[in-house]
Amino acid sequence: MAKEISSELLNTILTRVGGPGNIASCGNCMTRLRLGVHDSSLVDPDIKTLEGVKGVILTSDQVQVVFGPGKAHRAAKAMSELLGEAPVQDAAEIAAQNKRQLKARQTSGVQQFLAKFATIFTPLIPGFIAAGLLLGIATLIATVMHVTADAQGTLPDALNFMKVFSKGLFTFLVILVGYNAAQAFGGTGVNGAIIAALFLLGYNPTATTGYYAGFHDFFGLPIDPRGNIIGVLIAAWACARIEGMVRRFMPDDLDMLLTSLITLLITATLAYLIIMPLGGWLFEGMSWLFMHLNSNPLGCAVLAGLFLIAVVFGVHQGFIPVYLALMDSQGFNSLFPILSMAGAGQVGAALALYWRAQPHSALRSQVRGAIIPGLLGVGEPLIYGVTLPRMKPFVTACLGGAAGGLFIGLIAWWGLPMGLNSAFGPSGLVALPLMTSAQGILPAMAVYAGGILVAWVSGFIFTTLFGCRNVNLD
C-alpha cells in the first residue's frame, strides 16, 4: 500500500459504513481508524476484505479499521477531509437513529468507559515512545561506556540532554492527562489541566524542591495530594460533570465569565476534601495488586495469556493508568513487558502457520506481510489477518504469550524484577533498549529477550501441535 491512503479506498470504506450521514465521529489511535456510527446495522463487515485493510473491529457504535502505525493517522486525517465535503444528515434522522441505538450502547457501557482511556492517552503515546527511547539509548550508552552520573565532558552532556525529555514528560504528565481527560469526559480541557496542576503543587512550606502552592492546609484540614494519575482522572471527570451542570443554568452572557470560575472553585474543593485521599487509596490498592501479580509467575502467565483478548475487544487501553501507577510506585513499568509477551507468542504462532502452509498459499503471503510489524511490536496485522480468523492459532498464540509471561514472572520471583523505563512504549524487539531494572539495563534487556524467545518458541510449538488441525492453511 502506498504511503498515502488512497481516496478510492477511503470512499469505499465510507460507503460500506453507511455513508457520511452515518458517521458520528472520526478519529484514530496508533493503528486504527475509529469511526463512530449512528446505526451499526448499516455497516458492512466485509470492509476487512479490502486491500490495504488489515482488520476490522465492530462495536455497537464504532467501527475500528486497522491500517497500522502511521497509516491510521493519515487515514483519519483524509477521512475527516472527505467528511467535511460530504452532505450532513438531517438532525431529526440522526436523533431517531440515536434513540434506536441507545439500548445497544447501554449493553457495552464498560467497553465504552474503557475506550475513554484511548481518547485520553493515545495522543500522548508518541511522546512516551520518543522520550522512552531516548532515555533507554542514553542509559545503554552510559552503561556500556561506564559514564558515571557526575562525569563531565561532551558525552555526559549529550546523554543528559537525551534524558531531559523523559524528566520533563513525567514531571508535568498529570497536566497533559488532566487536559485530555476533561475533554474526553465532555468538559473544557484547560479546566482539567488547572485542576490536575493542584496535584503537582507542593503543600509543604519547608520543602526545598517542587512548586509551593502558597498554603499548607485547606481551611485547617490537611492536604495530601496523593493518587497522581488516578486522582487526576477522577478530578477531571468531576470537573467535566460540574461544568456541564453549571453551564445548564448559566445565562449565555455570563457563560465565558463565570462557568469556568465556578467549575474550578467547586472541583478544587472536592479535590482537596475527597478526591485526593480517595485517589491515594485507589492508587495504593492498584499498585499493590499488580505488583503482587507481577511477582507471581502464574499471575504473569495469566496476564500475558489474556492480553491478546483484551486487544481484540479494544479494552487494552484500560491498562494505561496501571502503567502510570507502577511507574510511580516502582520507578519502572513492570507490567508492560509481561503483556508484550502476548505479541511474541503470536509471532511464534504465525511462523508455525507459515511452515505448515503450502508454498504458494494466500496464508504464506499474509504471514509475510504481517510478520515484520509483529516482530517490531505491532500485532494487529497478525491478529486480524492471520490468527484470529482461524481461531485455533489465536488460542495457541495466547498460550505462547503465557509461557513468555511465566518466564519473566519466574525471573522476577528469583530476584530480578524488570520493566519498561516509560509508562508506555513500543513492544517487540524495538523495546529492548527501553528495559531497566535495579541491577541495570543489560540484565533487564537479557530477561526481556529471553521472554521473547520463550514466547516465540512456545507459540510455534503449541501451534504446530494443536493449532493447525482442521484449520484452513490455504
UniProtKB/Swiss-Prot annotation:
Active site per UniProt: C29
Reaction catalysed by this enzyme: N-acetyl-beta-D-muramate(out) + N(pros)-phospho-L-histidyl-[protein] = N-acetyl-beta-D-muramate 6-phosphate(in) + L-histidyl-[protein]
Coarse class of the protein's main subcellular location: membrane
Cellular location(s): Cell inner membrane
Membrane topology category: Multi-pass membrane protein
One GO term of the biological process aspect: phosphoenolpyruvate-dependent sugar phosphotransferase system
Enzyme Commission number(s) of this protein: 2.7.1.192
Pfam families registered for this protein in UniProt: PTS_EIIB (PF00367), PTS_EIIC (PF02378)
Cytoplasmic side: 1-123, 179-180, 239-260, 323-334, 390-393, 462-474
Transmembrane stretches, start-end: 124-144, 158-178, 181-201, 218-238, 261-281, 302-322, 335-355, 369-389, 394-414, 441-461
Keywords carried by this UniProt record: Cell inner membrane, Cell membrane, Kinase, Membrane, Phosphotransferase system, Sugar transport, Transferase, Transmembrane, Transmembrane helix, Transport
Domain PTS EIIC type-1: 115-474
Boundaries of every PTS EIIB type-1 domain copy: 1-89
Gene Ontology cellular component list: plasma membrane
A GO MF label: protein-phosphocysteine-N-acetylmuramate phosphotransferase system transporter activity
NCBIfam families xrefs: PRK09586.1 (NF007152)
Domain description: The EIIB domain is phosphorylated by phospho-EIIA on a cysteinyl or histidyl residue, depending on the transported sugar. Then, it transfers the phosphoryl group to the sugar substrate concomitantly with the sugar uptake processed by the EIIC domain.
Listed name of the protein: PTS system N-acetylmuramic acid-specific EIIBC component
Origin species: Escherichia coli (strain UTI89 / UPEC)
Encoding gene per record: murP
